[in-house]
Amino acid sequence: MELAWHLVLIVLLSFSCWGLDWDSDKNFISAAGPLTNNLLHNLRDPLGNQDPPFVAEDEEIYVCRQPLPAFLPEYFRSVRASMITHYKVFLPWAQLLPEGISENPDKGTVLCYRQLLEALKTAQLQPLVVLHHQTLPASTLQRTEAFADLFAAYASFAFRSFGDLVEIWFTFSDLERVITKLPHQESRSSRLQILTDAHRKAYEIYQEKYAAQGGKLSVVLQAEMVSKLLLEPSTSVLVKDAVDFVSLDLSYECHNEADLPQKLSELQTIEPKVKVFIFSLKLQNCLSTGNDIAQLLFGLLKAINEDQVLVVGFDISTFLSCPSSSKKSWACSLSDSLTLQTALQLGPDTAAYAWPPCSAYQRVWEAFANQSKAERDAFLQDVFPEGFLWGVSTGAFNVEGGWAEDGRGPSIWDRVGHQNTIKGQATPEVASDSYHKVDTDVALLRGLQAQVYKFSISWSRIFPTGQGHNPNPRGVAYYNKLIDSLLDSHIEPMATLFHWDLPQALQDRGGWQSEDVVDAFLDYAAFCFSTFGDRVKLWVTFHEPWVMSYAGYGTGQHAPGISDPGVASFKKVAHMVLKAHAKAWHLYNSHHRPQQQGRVGIVLNSDWAEPLSPERPEDLRAAERFLHFMLGWFAHPIFVDGDYPAALRAQIQQMNKQCPSPVAQLPEFTEAEKQLLKGSADFLGLSHYTSRLVSTAQGDTCIPSYDTIGGFSQHIDPMWPQTASSWIRVVPWGIRRLLKFVSLEYTKGKVPIYLAGNGMPIGESEDLIDDSLRVDYFNQYINEVLKAIKEDSVAVQSYVARSFIDGFEGPSGYSQRFGLYHVNFNDSSRPRTARKSAYFFTSMIEKNGFLNKVVKRQSSPGIANIPRKIRAFTFPSEVPSKAKVVWEKFSNQPKFERDLFYHGTFRDDFLWGVSSSAYQIEGAWDADGKGPSIWDNFTHTPGSNVKDNATGDVACDSYNHLDADLNMLQALKVKAYRFSISWSRIFPTGRNTSVNTHGVDYYNKLINGLVENNISPMVTLFHWDLPQALQDIGGWENPSLIDLFNSYADFCFQTFGDRVKFWMTFNEPTYQAWLGYGSGEFPPNVNDPGWGPYRIGHTIIKAHARVYHTYDEKYRQEQKGVISLSLSSHWAEPQSLVPRDVEAADRMLQFSLGWFAHPIFRNGDYPDAMKWKVGNRSELQHLATSRLPSFTEEEKRYIAATADVFCLNTYSSRIVQHTTPRLNPPSYTSDQELLEWEDTSWPATAMNRAAAWGTRRLLNWIKEEYGDIPVYITENGVGLTDPELEDTDRIFYHKTYINEALKAYRLDGVNLRGYAAWSLMDNFEWLNGYTVKFGLYHVDFNDVNRSRTARASARYYTEVITNNGMPLSKEDEFLYGQFPKDFIWSAATAAYQIEGAWRADGKGLSIWDTFSHTPLKVENNDTGDVACDSYHKIAEDLVALQTLGVTHYRLSISWTRILPDGTNKYVNEAGLNYYVRLIDTLLAANIQPQVTIYHWDLPQALQDVGGWENETIVQRFKEYAEVLFQRLGDKVKFWITLNEPYVVANQGYGYGTAAPGISFRPGTAPYIVGHNLIKAHAEVWHLYNDVYRARQGGIISITISSDWAEPRDPSNQEDVEAARRYVQFMGGWFAHPIFKNGDYPEVMKTRIRDRSLAEGLNKSRLPEFTESEKRRINGTYDFFGFNHYTTVLAYNLNYASWISSFDADRGVASITDRSWPDSGSFWLKMTPFGFRRILNWLKEEYNNPPIYVTENGVSHRGEANLNDTSRIYYLRSYINEALKALQDKVDLRGYTVWTLMDNFEWATGFSDKFGLHFVNYTDPALPRIPRESAKVYASIIRCRGFPDPAAGPHACLQQEDAEPTASPASPVSQKIQFLGLRLSTTEAQTALNVLFAFMLLGVCGVAFLSYKYFKHSKQKHTQPGEHELSHRSSF
């Protein structure tokens, strides 16, 4: 019987060939069992004679008893290894429920059976559980009538007790036997009915209560009973209604071939069709030879096939037997059998019993080998299944960059990249910089419409050393942001744990050749599952491990560059990877799947292999072997049997036998490892690129190589098209064949296939945008995938294209571009530009295949809650209008208040959009029947004055690139797209008799594309491009155009109105009328400034009204849209608030906005201001009538209220002043009687200066003038001449303008509903041609494809849309809390800035004395000769300090006041005595002195000998310090050696803007000075530490200053590095040597050295410290004294190599954000957030030293400004950020404000005022007057921070509010303040009475006007949400 067993196993292997199946997720059932007592006896005695080990006849069935036999687990594993999938278990009803009731079970028996079932599950055997087989409980025999209920109760008990372990149940296995056991007083039919009822009840209970267990239930029937049971409805339930499948007890007569078909044919009568399981098969009259068994098996299969009975499995026990001599195992495994070929030869010869082909490869080959080329390449027009996933992929090391950012550790690819072995010496350091571009990449994915994004996690970014102990939080944050952003955009993340980039630290320990890496990978995987698994539901453990094994450890072409194919690759790496994968899968399966419900798989790569010579069997075998070596190496252990393919092992064994020494070693898996591996994937990810022709290896060689070991050689067909990669040829049909092979060999329809990588590269020399070859590649390959699904039934569930963007491609560097998006690696911002293939791929996703999508007309997203025909006012506007209140409210705002940034959000349904217009973007000027427009005619006419003679012939070519435009809109996340329709594209002649269907189709496609993506179309009917045919009959001067325009509009409403819900009739008619018919600059170039604009405007208003009524009457009810027109205006700000200028400003608005708005939104007529001015000037010009036409009363009624919303285009502001212009010649501009100009302080742009604050005022004016009408800003943007993608100025523009709109909405109640940025992309900007760029997207007009690339502003605008405004970030929220009790509060000054007395009492000259007395050095020629005269005002200064309540006072010592010549030869006692008195006074007032030894005022005598450039200064400084320690050290316990050495070195000796004013050695002097300053500090620190610390007990350190720097573009690696460099060169220059390692920062040393050498020098200009100096300098601090004021935006700036300066060495340029509040100092912007960030940077960079903020403050200019709100804002904000830093665990010990009082601010003299106290320099007494900020600072000190108002009033704040009470004896003044006048009480009483009378009249007037007002309108006021009004919104 040994051969028979082998044949059975072969048959089992062949079931997939026959198509026998259960369903899509369960294996075919091959059953054995149950356990019997005889079987257990034989298993206990393996040396004795034994029966077949899994055969069980009806001998006594084993009843479970504890403990279970110890050998059972091993036995079950051997059973499973023999391809048996299920095992029968018979439950003993009587033993489980001895009393017959489920309430009292035998718990021991229950536990025993659970253990038995668990043992089966552990062995991966599924239990087949029979509820009852033989013995009935006694209780059932006594109550036959209750049998059904008792059995149902027992069944319920069993389901409940074992259901979690059982999937298949049988109620009875032998009905006849049970019938005989029941009492015989009942008839047989009655007893059968009892059993039927019992079964039915059990089935119903399972379905009702236990269906969630997912199991199936049946009853075993004898085949002969089926037809009888079906005859009786009462028993037919046993066959079809109460079973999930039919289970048969079947006997087979071997000599009667018709026996089995006859029995099975009866099952065909059952409807609906049922599945059949052969529970037991009894053979009769059968021989036991292999030949007969083979005939029997295949006869059985033939019978099943012929009768089309769906057999889901059967009992194979009858066939199983091993020879009695077999002692080695309990089961005969397939590996022990004869070869398949031998078995086939032993089979029968008859055709009826032909052996099924069992080689998956052979079956695929035979299926496709004979295809004709036409048949093979036939294109399938069909779609993919619903739910098919489309995506793109990347790998971390390919795209992320940021190789050393934020704590990431190096990977093996970083190491290889730095070895200069990559093509072009490329490295992955920056790559595509995706680490900084999450928002950019996700936007592109949105535009692409990707449904899944496959990316990999950089192991070393999470665990820098690879070990899972300390995860890198910033790396984790990056992936959290990426995953969250993907999900927010409805993109499924598919995360790969390992994509070839092993942490270098692990490679140093052996890499994948070490078992340790498996454990490390498991820790890493566990962390990822735990951290990201709540959102990631698709996991890939390894990406293409074959590549890593083959190229990384075999050929050495990939990292880590090891060339050892025989041992490292085969023996170690692949083996470790497989074990790591399996362990990770089981980890997820056991610990994470229940909660996370995700799937874990692996991505394997494989080429398809065809035999080179199909007629040669050896080539056929070689091709199959190739697949086993490439794909089966990893797939076979995971998806088949837990072990390597037999072909792989046999080939290696054969090679090793042929060679004198082994060429390869294939390790063995233990049985446990095999069980771990088998089935350890929820899906098979497959990547495929190309195919190979394979032949058997020629010649004998023992040189180890992949091909040699495999015994094959690879070839290509020269006819296969080439790609940029030598290894990829285009062979589309290979992917279909590979998928079929994978399905047959590995997945068998049970495991889904995810196609996870397919694509081809283009080369650097090819067209980088037009990748038509790749489009063809995708088109063909995707179609072959579709064939595999539709025609071959392969379960492919996704297609993921490689690659999303260009990236680092390993050995080929950046020379091969796989991306759908081109990345410009020559640009530091790494911009991405969509290729043609991106748009093709999007079309595939949209259509889900290859059939043109049936367009279902969807309704556009509605415009929310627009009231109809709002008419707030029906009376004309006054002159000046009541809207003048806007100027009264806003024009006196201080600049700080005006510009302060406001945080909040817009209404939930706010409509965010972008704008464009037809002529500016469409191009295709004469394509597809379009007629010419006036702009076509104009631009084609010589002398048109369009810059560069540009035309709109092609423009952005949007007519031919609709897919690109939709891609951008989706990426932006806009909710609306405002575009215009080209009248001449719809009606070429302008008339409805000439409809152009091609043009209509274009707009239908555009509108459908928008609506499908939930983007509302906002359509402008006319945007200046009148059909030339209509211009030829007079254009807008011809009244017939009103009807023609209405006809055109009617057609558009009828054709597009079902989807367009927002219409605008005209765009900016003011410009249309003036520029086209006034100045004549625009076509039709009519120069008639006095009459033309008014005539045209008149026609336009009537045309608009006509169209409005057409829509209102014919379409509105059905289409439910809104209609208006877009009006434009700058804001008009009066030069002064004198009435004539205010009237002029109002008049400017009436002549621009009011010209069209007043008739439409008010009373149907022009504004009086316009009528009066034009009328009066016409009369003065002796004209009979006004040049402004008039409307009839009927026309007024027709025009009034013909707009549903107010659409506004605005860009800038103007300063306006009244003037009286000349009368002639008449002109629209002169009629306004005003002058207008832009303030030169406003930021310049290409066309208008930016004045964002005007937007808020203009919106308020509209509200006041036209009522509470919904307002949409339909154009707002900025033109720049710079085409760069880093358009920071545009970001600032939109940021500030949108913020002003937000203020108008939230603070002023303007009913603002939407905002559309101008413009989507660069376009034809009228007379400016293409020289001015307004686009959020750059368009390359030199590229025939007009490629579009997102600018930085696009990313910013998307961020605003995502946030629906500008909400306050969590980081910026105000923090309430207190500082520690011992926190130091201080105020600072400096000697030269306040003392004065410059020559008093023997003081010597300092360099600042000299500098300030040098012409043109200090603003206003100010000096510090007197300053605040603090030398004589100790008492006054003390009062100021006591007002603040500070605990400390930071002052500096004037070196020359102590040592007049700078040396210790003479000590000036008078000067020293001043400091003694000052310090004693402080101490007496309980104020501790913080003394700065040097604050920039070097003795001039020392400067005369070189100053800080002379190394002797180190000793002079030490001597000076020692004098101070000796004389003052007993009083002073807080010393600062130097203040801001950066300023001393760079500004004093580099720029020359500070004393001593040296600027001619900027590349050397600052570094020499800095060098000496550091050494001087160190020597003084050591002096104090060694000599004075012990007895004086003080602390000493240095004060270092630094701005914080943010990258200008955080997504640009160069900017990130520039910001880091800025801080290191400023703060790190001095901090690094002292606080870190005694030497300069590495970046300083490297850059200065490199630039010095580039200049031709032989060494660096930066001096070097000796090793002993480094040791002496390092650690010379007790605290970190830190001065900080502001933040900058930094970006890289490369200076010419010949420029030698600090700035050139640093290579950084800096700017500031326009939204940051100004101060009185040009260099100081208020940026509180930077304070917290730089404090945290100090903590991280210098190991959290104790930090004292020794200066922080803000300046103003101008008047005394006692109510210094800007300083209050600054102090509260900055100190609050310091409190947050404390919360961040920064060791912050104290805060010092700069400054106590106004003083001499160096080169700005007394102009910059930093003081909390105002010093009146015009008063000889120089009084110190506290500002409001002094009170606020005192309050903060008193409260130790910021008490939470939610906790109620705090005592510290109540002190602030207390007012002094006047003494009774105090005289009371008889004069009182009344309305700004000092009056007697009698005078005030009289005045009050008069005012009261006036007030009564006013109240009556207001009441009357209110009545009239509310009668005509309803006002709605939007109230700002309290939660959005931060402390910053108080203005």
UniProtKB/Swiss-Prot annotation:
Topology class, membrane: Single-pass type I membrane protein
Active site per UniProt: 1068, 1275, 1540, 1751
EC code: 3.2.1.108, 3.2.1.62
Region (Glycosyl hydrolase-1 3): 905-1368
Annotated stretches, region: Glycosyl hydrolase-1 4: 1375-1848
Subunit structure: Homodimer.
Domain statement: The glycosyl hydrolase-1 3/region III carries the phlorizin hydrolase/glycosylceramidase activities. The glycosyl hydrolase-1 4/region IV carries the lactase activity.
Identification of the protein by name: Lactase/phlorizin hydrolase
Biological source species: Ovis aries (Sheep)
Primary gene name: LCT
